Swiss-Prot record:
It comes from the Bacteria. Belongs to the LpxH family. GO terms for molecular function: manganese ion binding; UDP-2,3-diacylglucosamine hydrolase activity. Hydrolyzes the pyrophosphate bond of UDP-2,3-diacylglucosamine to yield 2,3-diacylglucosamine 1-phosphate (lipid X) and UMP by catalyzing the attack of water at the alpha-P atom. Involved in the biosynthesis of lipid A, a phosphorylated glycolipid that anchors the lipopolysaccharide to the outer membrane of the cell. Keywords: Cell inner membrane, Cell membrane, Hydrolase, Lipid A biosynthesis, Lipid biosynthesis, Lipid metabolism, Manganese, Membrane, Metal-binding. This is UDP-2,3-diacylglucosamine hydrolase. It is found in: Cell inner membrane. The keyword Glycoprotein does not apply. It catalyses: UDP-2-N,3-O-bis[(3R)-3-hydroxytetradecanoyl]-alpha-D-glucosamine + H2O = 2-N,3-O-bis[(3R)-3-hydroxytetradecanoyl]-alpha-D-glucosaminyl 1-phosphate + UMP + 2 H(+). Transmembrane segments: none annotated. Its cofactor is Mn(2+). One of its GO terms (biological process) is lipid A biosynthetic process. Binds 2 Mn(2+) ions per subunit in a binuclear metal center. It comes from Neisseria meningitidis serogroup C (strain 053442).
Length: 240
């Protein structure tokens, strides 16, 4: 049976064209073209201020994902903490299906829970408070009514503050809370969890389930997880 691929945390931006090049290389590969599905679990872009922002980066990425979708490969997207404002307009343009924060998949007989991963980091209370605020639909609607320049400046300011705060936060609170994560997996009656966000690529064998953490993309490295009937494995981009 055809495999499924999982990626996240590419943080694409015009400042790092090498990351976009890595993505295009993967999307154009024969492996991706022969997949049953590709799942993008958030933070595809380093920031997103609205589907109405038209740029060469956004357009080229949407075009290449659409080409893959047009080949019959199902492409799914879960919003991340950087691109949570991606909406149906961009997803339609790219030929992607937008998924909720949590989804359960039947992958070759294994019930698999997928999410971006930021909701699992419950020890970072300041971030969870911030997340709750910015995910209010009314606030998002008001934000998207602002001129694009204002939104871009505000997003840049928020990123600067977030970067400074991250430098002084203890590393452990920026990882998933083990007890909460286990409860979520049990609540969805899953056998496996796949998430991103923490940038700590690894396959963990927890008590009663497997937790797979997708890594971030940087320089010449792309974190790509292949799932098929034999299990799940990270495969270097050179293999595609």
């Amino acid at each position: 049976m055809k495999p499924a691929y999982f990626i996240s945390d590419l943080h694409l931006s015009e400042k790092h064209p090498e990351l976009t090049a890595l993505l295009l290389r993967f999307l154009r590969s024969s492996a991706a073209g022969q997949a049953r599905a590709v799942y993008i679990l958030g933070d595809l872009f380093d920031f997103w201020v609205g589907d109405d922002e038209v740029s060469e980066l956004n357009t080229s990425v949407a075009r290449e994902i659409r080409k893959l979708s047009d080949k019959g490969v199902a492409v799914f997207f879960v919003r991340g903490n950087r691109d949570f404002l991606i909406g149906q307009d961009f997803c339609r343009q790219a030929g992607m299906t937008l998924l909720p924060d949590y989804s359960v998949l039947d992958l070759f007989g294994c019930k698999t829970l997928i999410c971006h991963g930021d909701t699992l980091c419950t020890d970072d209370r300041a971030y969870q408070r911030f997340r709750k605020i910015v995910h209010r639909k009314r606030l998002q609607k008001l934000f998207l009514m602002l001129p694009l320049k204002w939104r871009t400046r505000l997003a840049a300011k928020i990123r600067r503050v977030s970067k400074m705060e991250k430098q002084v936060k203890p590393a452990d609170i920026m990882d998933v809370n083990a007890a909460f994560t286990a409860r979520q997996v049990r609540a969805f009656n899953a056998e496996r969890l796949i998430h991103g966000h923490t940038h700590r690529e690894h396959i963990h064998h927890e008590n009663g389930f497997t937790r797979i953490v997708l890594g971030d993309w940087h320089n010449d490295y792309a974190s790509i997880l292949r799932v098929d009937g034999d299990g799940a494995v990270f495969v270097p981009l050179e293999k595609y």
